[in-house]
Amino acid sequence: FRNPYLRTTSVYQSLAAEGGTEPVFRTSPPEPWRLVRAYRRQALGKPANPGEINATGYFTASCGITIYRGDAYPEKYRGNLFVGDAAGNIVHRRTLQASGVTFRSHRADPDIEFVASSDNFFRPVNFINAPDGTLHVVDMYREVVEGPSWVPEDLKKQGLVDVLGA
């Protein structure tokens, strides 16, 4: 059932023109346990992506990737990708451009996020194109987005994080 004349170079396509790790611009303070965990990972000297060895500044919990299809906001937003980063308390916006049979995306706002909250409880996890043309943000408003297993035991015991149910 496959078209024998269609040559597929890869079944995987990264939309981000900038590559796999692009900085994000969070305004909320990093959680103390993230700072300690990043320091420990750096001290190990193991190769890792920037999101693992830095407490902030890179996507670590991107979610809810949604294309805005409404008409309530200016035309420049229509067809844009909106991406939540629940760990970074941000909503990131990207533009899409056709690239052959697929697309490429680019950061829409240089050096700033579409929404950057200083509230560490703001966890944008999904988006909904509403019937009135607006884009609704689903916020999992809570302190910790990670599961208890992601926080080192000794940090929980020191009181650097309050994980419900941990």
Residue ranges, per PLM feature:
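Beta-propeller domains with acidic blade repeats across secreted/periplasmic ectodomains
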Residues: 1-166
